[in-house]
Swiss-Prot record:
The gene is carB. It comes from Methanosarcina acetivorans (strain ATCC 35395 / DSM 2834 / JCM 12185 / C2A). One of its GO terms (cellular component) is cytoplasm. Belongs to the CarB family. It catalyses: hydrogencarbonate + L-glutamine + 2 ATP + H2O = carbamoyl phosphate + L-glutamate + 2 ADP + phosphate + 2 H(+). Residues 932-1070 are annotated as: Allosteric domain. This is Carbamoyl phosphate synthase large chain. It comes from the Archaea. The lineage of its organism: Archaea, Methanobacteriati, Methanobacteriota, Stenosarchaea group, Methanomicrobia.
Length: 1070
């Protein structure tokens, strides 16, 4: 069936901000779908609220709307653009939910829009838990016994029917949000209440437990001709009871018998046919001794399909998009081999391992147990010839400190941790085997297949040999083949990494590279995608062209998000446009940078010195770029420079800003000297290596002070400390964070306005991309604060000072490429807080707001062009207001207090654009799922320091027609200023208090600013309840003031502007 000629214009819905359960995989699949449709001559209209994505670049689609993913707004875009069809399954759960809502609202009928690919019926039959169960039973497939419920009373009845434990799965939610495992009746009611609130149709499925069964996934594809193929099968190392996004996963499955594989393969094809899904789909099974149950079907591109795409090299999203416009699998050419049709099933001659990356280093109080609801923010993937090699490379890729076996647990802890799955379980298995526990005992405690435990045992036994035997070249060859990195060998033998590396080279033990080609080398591949191993033949052939290697950003985690992948992709694109051969090394399967056709060569490897050097030794690039991959690649800059200097046989150099200059900016003392030279103000500060010194410095500066370790990303272990007791507690916890670095103590500029600047420098001129004014005050991490372009309250004098400082610092640090500078303004004076001569997390937002691709411009500067010759000298002046707001993951992390501070907590971001601040801020909050109410009740409970600013906020809210209520202190204070409202009991004074009111849906907005740590308990319970009951909440007075301004604007009845980013840029003359 050739492409449909009646489909000329297609609307694609993106997935919105990165959140737990929905990470960068949808940018990767969305970008692939956009390109796939454009190849077929179809016009693409894209809507997504997340500016940090490649898919929202103006050139990716014919019209790009960065607007809230809200059904009413998408309807306005449909009214304006009149697309012929819409593809729902590319934007993850968000895309499916909005498509279902629009269908229910009758929008598609009204405007004659067809749903392409998977029909709404199929979405309903998979997402509505009751319909799904009926469909499966109708075709004779087995599902766990279950019942869909809509009330707590119905949930109680299920306990009588099915007994405990039970699994709760809400309908239409993401990453298992709101679900969980209930082992008692109380737990069941608590999880069900949470799940009913989360579900779009207030429905949860309560099902019998298949805990301990193996979890296996099949990635399947079907076209309108009913041709079906199985792309990949994957096996979770963790058994059922842990969400697949939380489990370590291997592909292809390792423990299935051929009979089991054929049984599940046949079931998969039967299911996708029965559901009439067109495109890619993911089916999850529980398997036990030849018996199976179907757990769920995702009728869309998912996190698992991104993994399957990278594991096999098969571009699932690209093919799905072509099927949606009527093409058949045998008409679509496999873009990796360029000569086989997409109907050929991929074959693998290697093993991949995926391990999630969790944010528990940021949320110390959050519950670390892994359940059916996701908590991880990102993941890594590793490729090896054997299970052991793949697993060891995966551990190396995680970029966390828990090097194998460095953590110690006692016997009781080991048994507890094996029984309950946590983020450390794989490390605990290592430790248990080292202690002599048997494979059988560990398998019984964990329900993990003994096959996987025996593979880990093989690694543990090899470690014993390395410790006790002489490291001969035979043993070294054997351990490298097994996958041991040089750093681990150095630890086990008491040598340095360099010594191990030299031993290898002397013995001629060098890494070789194998190709991922979708067909186990049966056909010639056209798009090179490689992994390293230790075998005889090497499949990569270096060219003589000028080439540059770019280091990627690794797994998505808090503090290091998709923004750095965005910068990496832009740098690659710019260099390829210059005719330079460009290579990427990265290990994140969810991103655009690891797509098969982003770079000239892709190396799927851990981002460590050894693996980077392996690529350099083989390919001999002219230069390496480290400034685009965030802290991960910046941390490699100095060591890599030293290693390249040590290796006289290599001519490769680090391009862009010199690592020594990057280090100067990171080293507070050296940087302070530079600032003094330029006469630039900095907050008063000092550093300390002991508790005694810390107290002395803090007393000299005066409390409150901001304390942090040196060299950190995303403000880890950073805190505002108000008194000596607080400081003593911090010193006990923080000195562990970085033993060899002192702790920094700065004057905390209370009430200052924070400013961010992104710029490009070519060592002669400086291009300022934008000056951003933060909405939250200094003291909230810049990555967690909303910010606005252009600044709304900074005077011309202050802006002139900011521009002057930016130029001096960029030229003073000899920056070649990007630089981000954070400043704060207090009383008309500008203080510089820090400078980072590398890509920053605001680059994508700035690029979209002002229409300048800063990362591309920086890459061209590094390639040798000057800003002047490219015509980039003036700071852009947008006519519109752009606001970046963040997405906080508290709803997925029970137990964490939803409060902002100097340590970064957000996972993703959204953007609101309009012609005035009020409407832009309203859009940003709507996009961040924090809808500001225009009617209803607002609860206020504010710390004393914020009360003077509250009066104006309360007046605006009352004038807009909202009812106010608050706790006694706030009510009395406002009454003295002529604002009267109802009093509500404090939480610890008993009922009825605000939490009771939230439970009864009687509160529409919570404004609660936290007091000092000790008396936060009440506030913490209110904020936590707001998250659990899905009530919009605000925790800073600045955000409350911005919200009041937005509500005031919206009540004037002005419509929101619906315009594409292309139109906004056109108005700027771009």
């Amino acid at each position: 069936m050739p492409k449909r000629e009646d489909i000329k214009k297609v609307l694609l819905i993106g997935s919105g901000p990165i959140t737990i359960g929905q990470a960068a995989e949808f940018d990767f699949s969305g970008s692939q779908a956009c390109r796939s449709l454009k190849e077929e001559g179809v016009q693409v209209v894209l809507v997504n609220s997340n500016p940090a994505t490649i898919m929202t670049d103006p050139e990716m689609a014919d019209s790009v709307y960065i607007e809230p993913l809200d059904a009413r707004i998408v309807e306005k875009i449909i009214e304006k653009e009149r697309p012929d069809g819409i593809i729902a399954g590319i934007g993850g759960q968000t895309g499916l939910n909005i498509t279902s809502e629009l269908a229910e609202m009758g929008v598609f009928e009204k405007y004659g829009v067809q749903i392409l690919g998977t029909p709404v019926e199929a979405i309903k039959n998979t997402e509505d838990r009751e319909l799904f169960k009926e469909t499966m039973l109708r075709i004779g497939e087995k599902v766990p016994q279950s019942r869909a419920v809509h009330t707590l009373k119905e949930a109680e009845e299920v306990v009588e029917e099915l007994g405990l434990p039970l699994i709760v799965r809400p309908a239409y939610t993401l990453g298992g949000a709101g679900g969980g495992i209930a082992r008692t009746k109380e737990e069941l009611l608590e999880i069900t209440e949470r799940g009913l609130r989360r579900s779009r149709i207030s429905q949860v499925l309560i099902e019998e437990s298949v805990l301990g069964w193996a979890e296996v996934e099949y990635e399947v594809m079907r076209d309108a001709n009913d041709t079906c193929i199985v792309i990949c099968n994957m096996e979770n190392i963790d058994p059922m009871g842990v969400h697949t996004g939380e489990s370590a996963v291997v592909a292809p499955s390792q423990t299935l018998t051929d009979a089991e594989h054929q049984m599940l393969r046949s079931a998969s094809i039967k299911i996708i046919r029965a559901l009439k899904i067109e495109g890619g789909c993911n089916i999850q099974y529980a398997l036990k001794e030849g018996d199976y149950r179907i757990v769920e079907v995702n009728p869309r591109v998912s996190r698992s399909s991104a993994l399957a795409s990278k594991a096999t090299g098969y571009p699932i999203a690209r093919v799905t998009a072509k099927i949606a416009i009527g093409m058949a699998l045998d008409e679509i050419i496999n873009s990796v081999t360029k000569n086989t049709p997409a109907s050929f099933e991929p074959a693998l001659d290697y093993v991949i391992t995926k391990i999630p990356r969790w944010p528990f280093d940021k949320f110390v109080t959050a519950d670390k147990t892994l359940t059916t609801a996701m908590k991880s923010t990102g993941e890594i993937m590793a490729i090896g010839r054997t299970m052991e090699e793949s697993l060891l490379k995966a551990f190396k890729s995680l970029d966390i400190d828990s090097q194998l076996g460095n953590k110690r647990w006692d016997e009781h802890e080991v048994k507890t941790l094996l029984k309950t799955p946590t983020s450390e379980r794989l490390f605990v298995i290592f430790h248990a085997l080292e202690r002599g526990m048997s494979v059988k005992e560990i398998a019984e405690l964990t329900s993990i297949n003994p096959f996987f435990i025996s593979k880990i045992k093989k690694i543990v036994e090899m470690e014993k040999r390395i410790r006790t035997e002489e490291l001969t070249s035979e043993l070294l060859r054997e351990v490298k083949k097994l996958g041991f990195p040089d750093t681990r060998l150095a630890e086990l033998t008491g040598k340095t990494r360099e010594q191990i590396s030299d031993l290898r080279h002397d013995a001629g033990i060098l890494a070789t590279f194998k190709m991922v080609d979708t067909c186990a080398a049966e056909f010639q591949a056209a798009t090179p995608y490689y992994y390293s191993t230790y075998e005889d033949t090497c499949e990569t052939n270096p060219t003589d062209r000028k080439k540059i290697l770019i280091l990627g950003a690794g797994p998505i985690r808090i503090g290091q998000g998709i923004e750095f992948d965005y910068c990496t992709v832009h740098a690659v694109t710019a260099l390829r446009e210059e005719g330079i051969e460009t290579h990427i090394i990265n290990n994140n399967p969810e991103t655009v940078s690891t797509d098969f056709d982003t770079s000239d060569k892709l190396f799927f490897e851990p981002l460590t010195m050894e693996y980077v050097m392996n690529v350099i030794e083989r390919e001999r690039p002219d230069g390496v770029l480290v400034q685009f991959g965030g802290q991960t690649s910046v941390n490699l800059a100095l060591p890599l420079k030293k290693e390249l200097k040590r290796r006289t046989d290599l001519d490769t150099m680090i391009m862009g800003t010199d690592p020594e200059d990057m280090d100067l900016a990171e080293d507070r003392e050296k940087f302070y000297v530079l600032m003094q030279k330029f006469g630039i103000l900095q907050p008063e500060g000092g550093y300390a290596t002991s508790q005694h010194e810390a107290i002395e410095v803090a007393q000299r500066i005066g409390f409150p002070v901001l304390v942090r370790p040196s060299y950190v990303l995303g403000g880890r272990a950073m805190e505002i400390v108000y008194d000596e007791i607080d400081l003593e507690r911090y010193m006990k916890e923080a000195v562990r964070v970085s033993p060899e670095h002192p702790i920094l103590i700065d004057d905390f500029l209370e009430g200052a306005c924070e400013i961010d600047v992104d710029a490009v420098c070519d060592r002669k001129d400086v291009l300022i991309g934008a000056i951003m004014e933060h909405i939250e005050e200094a003291g909230v991490h810049s990555g967690d604060s909303a910010c606005v372009i252009p600044p709304q309250s900074l005077s011309e004098d202050v802006l002139a000072q900011v521009r002057d400082y930016t130029r001096k610092i960029a030229l003073g640090l000899r920056v070649k490429g990007l630089i981000n500078i954070q400043m704060a303004e207090k009383g008309g004076k500008v203080f510089v807080l820090e400078a980072n001569p590398r890509s920053s997390r605001t680059i994508p937002f700035v690029s979209k707001a002002v229409g300048l691709p800063l990362a591309k411009i920086a890459a061209r500067v590094i390639a040798g062009h000057s800003l002047k010759e490219m015509g980039y000298t003036d700071e852009p002046k947008p006519k519109h207001v752009s606001i970046k707001e963040v997405l906080l993951p508290f709803d997925k992390l029970p137990g964490a207090d939803p409060v902002l501070g100097p340590e970064m907590k957000s996972t993703g971001e959204v953007m609101g654009i309009d012609y005035d601040f009020g409407r832009a801020y309203y859009k940003a909050e709507l996009a961040a799922d924090n809808l500001l109410p225009l009617t209803g009740k607002v609860f206020l409970s504010i710390r004393n320091a914020d009360k003077p600013e509250l009066v104006e906020v309360a007046r605006k809210l009352q004038a807009a027609g909202l009812e106010l209520m608050g706790t006694r202190g706030t009510v009395n204070y406002l009454a003295q200023h002529g604002v009267f409202m109802d009093t509500v009991k404090k939480v610890h004074d008993g009922s009825p208090n605000v939490i009771d009111m939230m439970r009864r849906d009687e509160v529409d907005l919570i404004i609660n600013t936290p007091t000092s740590k000790q008396s936060r308990r009440d506030g913490s319970r209110i904020r936590r309840a707001a998250v659990d009951f899905k009530v919009p909440y605000i925790t800073t007075i600045q955000a409350a003031s911005a919200a009041a301004a937005a509500i005031e604007t919206m009540k004037k009845g002005e419509d929101l502007t619906i315009k594409s980013i292309n139109e906004y840029h056109k108005e700027m003359g771009l």
